[in-house]
């Protein structure tokens, strides 16, 4: 058995624990809603977590694949062996956990917020279809953050984590970040054309909702294109200055 392998019983044990902790204090819904989340690394997707938690008065289960990586039975050994490259070896475990949780929790009709990047169209399309077949209203929420700002955030996050625990710090490869950014608009357009989402919303980091398909007739992809690659607002310029200052402070430590 390789170090990245895990047994079926180890996986089931972790799954049962996640089901218990994620549903604590939550109720199932007669008309469940599932929100798929998209945006590049460092864009600030947790902003949407907070908005939706408030909107649903806490009655929504957040499924975030990254949070399951550390549950891999050999996580510490993988960290020691591969350092920051260990993400490649925990990917399978975390992905399978997300899939299993979505299947189980949707059968129980909980409101769901499923974290993703929208790197491809296939995963959100498949997930949306599965949930629609189970009677869910499926929505898409995107966070639109200028690529320079999101990549800067990944660098800050890495340095902050590195100070706490060098083994656990996870750098985001720039090509991985840029790949998501460069496909975000096209993938949003494809998903819009498939018309599988009953609602598409676009948020910015300052928590403002800048697009809602229930109110806007324009294309979400066009709005996203402008927000990602168009003119910089004053707020964005200030965010960049603050971020660069923070990164320099961390690098000087």
Swiss-Prot record:
ATP binds at residues 39-46. Changing residue 157 to A: Abolishes lethality. Gene3D superfamilies: P-loop containing nucleotide triphosphate hydrolases (3.40.50.300). This is Toxin PezT. It comes from the Bacteria. Changing residue 45 to A: Abolishes lethality. Its EC number is 2.7.1.176. The keyword Membrane does not apply. InterPro entries: P-loop_NTPase, PezT, Zeta_toxin_domain. Belongs to the zeta toxin family. Keywords: ATP-binding, Kinase, Nucleotide-binding, Repressor, Toxin-antitoxin system, Transferase, Virulence.
């Amino acid at each position: 058995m390789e170090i990245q392998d895990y047994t079926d019983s180890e996986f089931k044990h972790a799954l049962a624990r996640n089901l218990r902790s994620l549903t604590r204090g939550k109720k199932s819904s007669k008309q469940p809603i599932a929100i798929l989340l998209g945006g590049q690394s460092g864009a600030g997707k947790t902003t949407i977590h907070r908005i939706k938690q408030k909107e649903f008065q806490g009655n929504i289960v957040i499924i975030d694949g990254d949070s399951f990586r550390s549950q891999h039975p050999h996580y510490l050994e993988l960290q020691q062996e591969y350092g920051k490259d260990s993400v490649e070896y925990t990917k399978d475990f975390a992905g399978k956990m997300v899939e299993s949780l979505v299947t189980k929790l949707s059968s129980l009709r909980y409101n769901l917020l499923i974290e993703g990047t929208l790197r491809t169209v296939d995963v959100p399309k498949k997930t949306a279809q599965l949930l629609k077949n189970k009677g869910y209203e499926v929505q898409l929420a995107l966070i639109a953050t200028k690529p320079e700002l999101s990549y800067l955030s990944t660098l800050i996050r890495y340095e902050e984590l590195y100070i706490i625990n060098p083994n656990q710090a996870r750098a985001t490869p720039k090509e991985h970040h840029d790949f998501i950014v460069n496909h975000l608009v096209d993938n949003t357009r494809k998903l819009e054309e498939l018309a599988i989402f009953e609602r598409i919303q676009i948020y910015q980091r300052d928590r403002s909702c800048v697009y809602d398909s229930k109110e806007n007739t324009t294309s979400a992809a066009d709005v996203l294109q402008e927000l990602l690659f168009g003119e910089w607002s004053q707020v964005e310029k200030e965010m960049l200055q603050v971020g660069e200052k923070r990164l320099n402070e961390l690098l000087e430590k």
